[in-house]
C-alpha cells in the first residue's frame, strides 16, 4: 500500500473537489462541462469505494488480532480478514494502474465488405446487426450515420455511432475496442445453388468518439464538402432534397459521409463527428508507435488471410485467433451475446499490459 499511498491521496482530494462541483447548480448550466465532471467522478468512484473498504477491513483485522491474542477462537476470523485485506489491496492496486484514456468514450464503428462479393456484403450486415443487438442489450443508443447497400440488402459499408447511457468508467469503447480487424465467415451463401461452404470476409474499424468536435483541431480550409441526393429514411426515396453530406479531409484523404439525418445541417454535424473521431485516432497513431501498430493491425486490407476471428456456420462455432478463444454458440453471438468473448479479450489485454509494466 505504501507504493499507492501518494496516488490514493491525490484521488481522494480530486474526489472531494468533484463532489463539490457536482453539487454546484451552476455546473449543470453547462451540460458539456457537467458531463465531463460526471464522467471523471464515475471513473474514480470505484477507487475511492475500494479504498474505504480496505481501510475498514484493516481496522477489523487489527481488532481481530487483539481479540485472538486472548481468545484462540478468533484465529479463523483473523485468517478470513487477512485474505480480505490482501484481495482488496490487490483490487486497489489494479484500479490505480493506468487505464486506456478512451475507455469511457462512445464510439464510431465502420463495417466494410471485402472479398466475397454479395456474400461479403451480407456478412457485413450480419456484423452490423450483431453490434446493434449487443448495444441494445446494454441500453446504449445506436445511430446509423450512413450505409451503402448491396443488391441483396447487405452492406458494402456502414457507419454506426454507439453511445453509452451515462457516465461510466467502462464505456462503449472499453467493450468494443477489440473489434477492429478482419472478420472471416464460413457458410453456404444464399447465392450458392450447390450447397457448398464458401469463405468470405468483412472488415471492422472502431474509433473512440471525442466528447466534442472542437476537441480535435480541424481547419475548415482542409475540407471539401459535397452534398448529394439522399434516399431518405428507410430508403423509400421520400427525401428529394440534396441533404446527404460527404466530407473529404484533403491532407489525409479521409472521406466520411452521412445521409440518414433529416437535414443537410444535421448530416454535416454527424459527418464532422465521425471525421473528428478518425482524425483523433490518426493523431494518436502518429504520436505512439505502439498505438500505430495496434491500429494498423485492425484492418490493412479486407483480406481473408488477415483475420482476427472466424464465424463458422456449419459448426455453429466462433473462434477468436488472437487469444485462442472458441465457443459453439455462434447463433447467440450473432444475436448480441458477446460479453463472454469481450471479457476474455479484456482479460488477455490486462495480462499483456501487466507483463509490459
Curated annotation (Swiss-Prot):
A GO term, aspect molecular function: translation release factor activity, codon specific
Q: Which residues carry this modification: N5-methylglutamine?
A: 236
- Please give the PROSITE patterns that the UniProt record associates with this protein: RF_PROK_I
Kindly provide the PTM information from the record.
Answer: Methylated by PrmC. Methylation increases the termination efficiency of RF1.
Asked if the record carries the keyword Transit peptide, the reply is no
Q: Where in the cell is it found?
A: Cytoplasm
Q: Which cysteines are joined by disulfide bonds?
A: none
Q: Which residues form a coiled coil?
A: none
Q: Which GO terms describe its cellular component?
A: cytoplasm
Which of UniProt's keywords are assigned here?
Answer: Cytoplasm, Methylation, Protein biosynthesis
One Pfam family, short name:
PCRF
Q: Does the keyword Protein biosynthesis apply?
A: yes
In the record, the note on similarity to other proteins reads: Belongs to the prokaryotic/mitochondrial release factor family.
Question: What does the record give as the function of this protein?
Answer: Peptide chain release factor 1 directs the termination of translation in response to the peptide chain termination codons UAG and UAA.
What is the recorded name of this protein?
A: Peptide chain release factor 1
Q: Which organism is it from?
A: Mycolicibacterium vanbaalenii (strain DSM 7251 / JCM 13017 / BCRC 16820 / KCTC 9966 / NRRL B-24157 / PYR-1) (Mycobacterium vanbaalenii)
Gene that this polypeptide is encoded by: prfA
Amino acid at each position: 500500500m505504501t507504493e499507492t499511498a501518494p496516488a490514493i491521496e491525490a484521488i481522494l482530494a480530486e474526489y472531494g473537489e468533484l463532489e463539490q462541483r457536482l453539487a454546484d447548480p451552476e455546473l449543470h448550466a453547462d451540460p458539456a462541462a457537467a458531463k465531463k465532471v460526471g464522467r471523471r467522478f464515475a471513473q474514480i468512484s470505484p477507487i475511492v469505494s475500494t479504498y474505504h473498504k480496505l481501510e475498514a477491513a484493516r481496522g477489523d483485522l487489527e481488532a481481530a488480532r487483539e481479540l485472538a491474542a486472548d481468545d484462540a477462537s478468533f484465529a479463523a476470523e483473523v485468517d478470513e480478514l487477512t485474505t480480505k485485506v490482501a484481495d482488496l489491496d490487490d483490487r486497489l492496486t489494479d484500479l490505480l494502474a493506468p487505464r486506456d484514456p478512451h475507455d469511457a468514450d462512445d464510439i464510431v464503428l465502420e463495417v466494410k465488405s471485402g472479398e466475397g462479393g454479395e456474400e461479403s456484403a451480407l456478412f457485413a450486415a450480419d456484423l452490423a446487426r450483431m453490434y446493434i443487438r449487443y448495444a441494445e442489450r446494454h441500453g446504449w443508443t445506436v445511430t446509423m450515420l450512413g450505409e451503402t447497400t448491396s443488391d441483396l440488402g447487405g452492406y458494402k459499408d456502414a457507419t454506426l455511432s454507439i453511445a453509452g447511457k451515462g457516465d461510466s468508467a467502462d464505456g462503449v469503447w472499453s467493450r468494443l475496442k477489440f473489434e477492429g480487424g478482419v472478420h472471416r465467415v464460413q457458410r453456404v451463401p444464399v447465392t450458392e445453388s450447390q450447397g457448398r461452404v464458401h469463405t468470405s470476409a468483412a472488415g471492422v474499424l472502431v474509433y473512440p468518439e471525442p466528447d466534442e468536435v472542437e476537441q480535435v483541431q480541424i481547419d475548415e480550409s482542409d475540407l471539401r464538402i459535397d452534398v448529394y441526393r439522399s434516399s431518405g429514411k428507410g430508403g423509400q426515396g421520400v427525401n428529394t432534397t440534396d441533404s446527404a453530406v460527404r466530407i473529404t479531409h484533403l491532407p489525409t484523404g479521409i472521406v466520411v459521409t452521412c445521409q440518414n439525418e433529416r437535414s443537410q445541417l444535421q448530416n454535416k454535424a454527424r459527418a464532422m463527428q465521425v471525421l473528428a473521431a478518425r482524425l483523433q485516432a490518426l493523431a494518436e497513431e502518429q504520436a505512439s508507435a505502439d498505438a500505430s501498430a495496434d491500429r494498423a493491425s485492425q484492418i490493412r486490407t479486407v483480406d481473408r488471410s488477415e483475420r482476427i476471428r472466424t464465424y463458422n456456420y456449419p459448426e455453429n462455432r466462433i473462434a477468436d485467433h488472437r487469444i485462442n478463444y472458441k465457443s459453439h454458440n455462434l447463433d447467440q453471438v450473432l444475436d448480441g451475446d458477446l460479453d463472454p468473448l469481450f471479457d476474455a479479450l479484456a482479460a488477455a489485454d490486462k495480462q499483456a499490459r501487466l507483463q509490459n509494466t
